[in-house]
């Protein structure tokens, strides 16, 4: 009996969650997410929200927790891309600032370092800065209602990679040895190829 009560309670919770999601999403779709959804997306989502609401008060009044969860997941599949666009719009500037702060920090940190360290770190910083600038320009011409070409998570990954590489360079006092690039033997033979006039 307790197990049956538990199932009924879970189903009730899932139904309430689905119902709340329908109302919340309808509100956000025409307010918060307005500029982040295409007209066809808004139309499709509105239609699905209306169908779900009608189902909840007609056929879906007494279903299992799994049925309500499945309905919720179906709606989220439609809404999640829009929510990602909205959230990433706010997260990108902060992530970009963090990356630019890291670049400035490393540029300042290597000013008195040996030339090989300074040049290697400055090259990594320039590469990260150029990547950010190019991607930001691409993103700036995109409408807000399409999936971003530059995600804040990509900027964070670039900042993490920059931190790892620059720290390795500064610890080893020189450019990191990149195992995939076996050109170290080329550097030793270059001196013999020079000709005098």
What are these regions (language model features)?
Residues 1-197:
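PAZ/PAZ-like end-binding module
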């Amino acid at each position: 009996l307790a197990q049956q009560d538990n199932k009924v309670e879970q189903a009730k919770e899932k139904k309430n969650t689905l119902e709340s999601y329908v109302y919340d999403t309808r509100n956000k779709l025409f307010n918060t997410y307005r500029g982040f959804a295409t007209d066809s997306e808004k139309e499709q989502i509105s239609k699905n929200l209306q169908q779900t609401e009608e189902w909840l008060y007609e056929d879906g009044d007494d279903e299992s927790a799994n049925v309500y969860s499945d309905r919720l997941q179906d709606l989220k599949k439609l809404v999640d891309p829009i929510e990602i666009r909205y959230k990433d719009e706010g997260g990108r500037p902060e992530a970009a600032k963090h990356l630019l702060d890291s670049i400035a920090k490393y540029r300042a940190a290597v000013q008195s370092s040996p030339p090989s360290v300074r040049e290697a770190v400055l090259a990594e910083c320039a590469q990260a800065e150029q990547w950010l600038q190019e991607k930001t320009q691409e993103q700036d011409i995109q409408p807000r209602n399409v999936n971003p070409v530059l995600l804040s998570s990509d900027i964070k990954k670039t900042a993490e990679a920059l931190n790892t590489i620059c720290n390795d360079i500064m610890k080893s006092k020189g450019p990191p040895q990149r195992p995939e690039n076996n050109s170290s033997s080329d550097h030793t033979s270059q001196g013999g190829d020079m000709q005098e006039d």
